[in-house]
Amino acid sequence: MTVRERSAALPHTGTGLGIWPGAMRALDALGVGDEVRRRGSRQAGGSIRRPDGSRIATVDVERLERRHGEPVHLVARPVLLAVLAGALPGPALRLDAPVTGPGSLRDAYDLVVGADGINSVVRAQMYGQRYPLRYAGAVAWRGVVDLDLAEGGETWGRGRKFGLTPAGPGRTNWYAAVRLPEGHPAPPDDRAELRRLFGDWHPPVPRVLDALTPDGILRHEIHDLTPLPSYVAGRTALLGDAAHAMTPDLGQGACQALIDAVALADCLRDAGDVPAALRAYDRRRRRPTQRIAAGARWAGRLSGVRRLLPVRDALLRLALAAGPPA
């Protein structure tokens, strides 16, 4: 087994990830669940508010924990990657080893797994440009600031939102999204633009904006992936964003990648040969992940509406009552 990573080193900084119960079960199956629990934190309840601070809805994380027997855990992305890398056999991980032509790997390995992200080279080898990325209608900013906030949550305005999650002692993960046409020019000063868009919103949003540093802001357009007809072909499989890149609105991208990986391992263990295992994996994972991706796209559109805000708020409360994917 070889894990090829294009970066020369694992990251030391990065935003926080919410690990939902299903993903934590996957980490338990990999033998690293307790380490992630130890190095992360339990997510406290949060609210979704309007810019004036009035509450639209409350996220009942205790109900989720009662239902699934596991809370949502928050862990920094570099921590999760370090834990996963530490569980590999020493020689398995090859850094600074990008895959440029996955076809050549098929001659050297029994199985090629493309876990190479939204711009997957392996997916392009399988499908070309037949299933392109789709612009989700919004631009996002995100980062981490040196602030200690006990509770996270989101605030929804007209066509824009701002979110916060604790990211460990003295650290807070923040993100913002604004509905904009594709290719909209980037502002010359992201901090000034964020202050213009969100500076008069309820506390602690202005405090977070004041803590921003120019090199601590990431800006990107939000895309997801046109649904694929299959995640497998021959002895090649796709997982995670390579298979079902989704918008971040349900916080499920990393979680579903972890569940994919364990499902693929289970199918390989139980099936008689690799092609049969991959067909079983595709049956097991494609429909659930594409359903979640569609839900994330819908949630992003809902949070970004500019009109009929009372209808938006009522739909949000109904969606929360039904419960998020766990």
Protein language model regions, located:
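Flavin-dependent oxidoreductases
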Residues: 138-166
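FAD/FMN-dependent oxidoreductases across multiple families
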Residues: 158-160, 168-169, 178-250, 256
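Residue-level marker for buried hydrophobic side chains located in beta-strands
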Residues: 1-4, 112, 232, 236-239
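Conserved N-terminal helical subregion
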Residues: 20-127, 131-146, 181-195
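C-terminal helical "tail/cap" subdomain of flavin- and related membrane-associated enzymes
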Residues: 38, 207, 229, 250-251, ...
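Glycine-rich FAD pyrophosphate-binding loop
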Residues: 1-15
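Short, glycine/acidic-enriched loop or turn micro-motifs at the edges of active sites
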Residues: 8, 119, 238, 244, ...
